[in-house]
């Protein structure tokens, strides 16, 4: 796969990235698995359908795993499908709920080992070793699926300032807006659209 991880601020941004012929030239006739765990407090079904839509024009085979809570985190079929999929998509929703379900579980390990991991919206914060608690902006423990950045979505300025003040000065924080995207090839993160990256108080460029 051309990327190891794709973070998008919204489904609209995912649509745009999926239409990028150069970046995703191999995203045809691929096996896509959607994990809508983060949408457990709204609708897993609606989230799954919404996440599948951007892949509909790419001749992808799409399956959704309705993983709502920890009762199925050791399900052998779920684990197998996550490991064999070309692309695993994590829906937007509650990052804290997603973390609590996936942490220290066979399903969580399979998500982390995905060939290409796509995270939509707030759920992207769980990807790194450090995530941002959406309730107040404090750094906390992430799942370590993809590292090198601390990722969060757009928040009120006061909360964002608090987040930056609590991170070490050598840590890069990427704030992904609704039209923003981050691509990771396993070595380097690259930003496009509405993304602001900072190290301490300074704005930095990702490349």
What do the predicted segments below correspond to?
Residues 59, 85, 114, 146-147, ...:
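Short, well-ordered alpha-helix to beta-strand connector turns
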């Amino acid at each position: 796969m051309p990327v190891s991880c794709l973070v998008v601020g919204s489904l609209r941004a995912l649509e745009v990235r999926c239409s990028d012929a150069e970046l995703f030239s191999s995203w045809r006739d691929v096996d896509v698995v959607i994990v809508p765990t983060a949408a457990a407090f709204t609708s897993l079904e609606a989230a799954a359908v919404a996440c599948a839509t951007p892949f509909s024009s790419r001749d992808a085979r799409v399956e959704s795993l309705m993983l709502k809570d920890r009762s199925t985190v050791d399900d052998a079929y779920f684990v197998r499908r996550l490991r064999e999929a070309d692309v695993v998509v994590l829906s937007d929703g509650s990052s804290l709920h997603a973390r609590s379900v996936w942490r220290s579980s066979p399903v969580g390990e399979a998500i982390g080992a995905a060939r290409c991991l796509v995270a939509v919206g707030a759920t992207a914060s769980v990807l790194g070793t450090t995530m941002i608690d959406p309730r107040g902006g404090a750094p906390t423990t992430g799942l370590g699926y993809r590292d090198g950045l601390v990722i969060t979505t757009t928040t009120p300025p006061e909360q964002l300032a608090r987040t930056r003040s609590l991170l070490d000065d050598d840590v890069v924080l990427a704030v992904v807006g609704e039209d923003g995207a981050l691509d990771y090839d396993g070595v380097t993160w690259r930003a496009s659209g509405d993304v602001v990256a900072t190290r301490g108080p300074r704005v930095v460029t990702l490349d």
